[in-house]
């Protein structure tokens, strides 16, 4: 926001030789255009397949456990396809990966296909991050447990199901203490849409939102 404000000020002084190109997968193009005195907007649509969305009746008290149950239900009941599970950070991802691997091992043998659980976050070494781009072995479903890095930064082929806990970890400034902290906060509506869209990149998919539709409509900004 600060950068856009500075660019608008610079344009007034250097309109003849300063050209600004803003690209984004999430910004509201009309708002940005109005802010920059009605500048043109170019839309480059991608191929998006339909995504069916399912909402929880209420907010779960423990989003990790709720995500875990949803992932297991998908594995047992749904057709083949990889699952992308959004968590807030490395600690949540580590817990989710451990619990999911344990729960899958305890499933009745032959009741479902094999499974491969992969974490994805910025702290992973590059050689571990690129594992998510390798296709799943035959008769195997991949579970990719990721931070918001998987919202817009990359597309993972094979993802058909998305589990969205509705939270993200963000850097917040506390004016009373003058310090920053990493806090778990609700995602925005744009982020929710981006997460759901991950399920429709290569074929029709499903998104399981662990919050009611009323929260998406009224509370997400």
List each language-model region with its residue ranges.
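P-loop NTPase motor module signature
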Residues: 1-221
